[in-house]
């Protein structure tokens, strides 16, 4: 149970910090409306600079995108930048060490949703847990008739300091060693998990032996106006079906780290805190030719 203890102990060091403004993991539009003018609140939009500039945004927000936080490693895996580089990027967004942070996505595509949840996990990884994701994103904000603006503020570098909680990440080699001892959740679509189909970027069909499936797409919706958004459940379907205790240690994987991080955010908001994200995920797992099952089912269906 060593890994479980590491996670809980590390997180408690951060959860015990006191903040003047405390952000819930899943932020309601009512909460954000009430606290919008608070000087200790920082708001980050995940979209692109053109959309942020010309299609309005939540007042006081700054903009970033998913690709700002990841790079292609030498083996072709997409992974987070090193801790200090991530911290510098956060400071450049004007984030201070004691800021309450709300992240939202525009929802022009599902990548923006994944980017928002990935950034949420990165804040946790860097030791800043006073952060939340706006439930239903920009779509929800417009539906609630929240304030919007077109002006962009001048950004002054913030004072953010990383206090890394690296136990919130699990590396590929460690995952292979410990996967039989913990609940391993794969966030890919059901047909990918079943070994029937795959993303083009994935070199192999199949799944990690013993893993369970909770597709992040289960919680994605598209509004008539074209915006995508995530509808957070009270309890994720898989965890409800398996009757998973909130204290149980859970390992999260996907094809890439953004799908893993999406489930991290959804699970965390539902009260599951003993979580570790596989950032390099199945891209690296399959490059290293580590064990899979259901690798030939796609051939049987042709």
Give, region by region, the residue ranges found by the protein language model.
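Active-site neighborhoods of enzymes that stabilize oxyanions during catalysis
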Residues: 21, 25-27, 34, 53, ...
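Thiolate-centered catalytic microenvironments shared by cysteine-dependent enzyme domains
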Residues: 83-174, 197, 259-281
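Sec/Tat signal peptide C-region and signal peptidase I cleavage site
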Residues: 16-20
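C-terminal soluble interaction/assembly domains
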Residues: 237, 242-301
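N-terminal carbohydrate-binding/catalytic regions of secreted carbohydrate-active enzymes
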Residues: 39, 43-92
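Sec-dependent N-terminal signal peptides
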Residues: 5-14
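Helix-loop module immediately N-terminal to the HCX5R catalytic loop
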Residues: 71-101, 216-250
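Structural recognition of the beta-strand scaffold that forms the well-ordered cores
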Residues: 42-45, 61-65, 99-104, 132-133, ...
